[in-house]
């Protein structure tokens, strides 16, 4: 059996955790449409710090550190404009939000950083949500999931891949890199059961 190293209380349900490659601190992100992220020390040597999303945004449950540990990237919802953004946080500045990149889609979920730190890969699930409606999915008839590749330094769009038109209700959610650096992704079907691919 394992030994409990530390325990971190969260304001509400969390979704995913990412760890700094330099100092080992973790950040757990709220499940969407949550507005918190909690920075914690897995060894329990420092008190947790709660971050609150900026006005007009909420977290989508995922994030990643830059390889040098200086930046934290987080998937966020610009909910009044139904668009995904990547929030950028300055770690040394107390995780102060210093900007955002357009993620070129709706309903971002997981985001990964390539091993060399040059590219952000974003799974835009294609589902519009708004905190005024809880977790209600507002556009199932017009979903547009896509996979986006962004320059991690500038936010510039490197590429965007879409599923074939008949698969528009497959919401791209989670991803992984294989040993060759290829991206594999999993989807959730959000259509009627009788039309499931």
Language model region names:
Residues 1-29:
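Beta-strand-rich domains and repeat architectures in extracellular enzymes and scaffolds
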Residues 3-9, 46-53, 96-101, 156-165:
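A short beta-strand motif characteristic of beta-propeller blades
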Residues 12-19, 57-64, 106-112, 168-174:
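Repeated scaffold domains used in trafficking and secretory/extracellular systems
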Residues 21-23, 66-68, 115-116, 178-180:
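Residue-level detector of Asp-centered blade-edge/turn motifs that repeat once per structural unit
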Residues 26-27, 72, 120, 183:
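Hydrophobic beta-strand positions that form the internal "hydrophobic ladder"
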Residues 30, 38-41, 76, 87-90, ...:
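Structural recognition of the beta-propeller blade-terminating site
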Residues 75-79, 122-143, 185-196:
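Short, conserved, GDST-rich strand-edge loop motifs in beta-rich repeat architectures
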Residues 85-93, 137-153, 196-197:
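Beta-propeller blade signature
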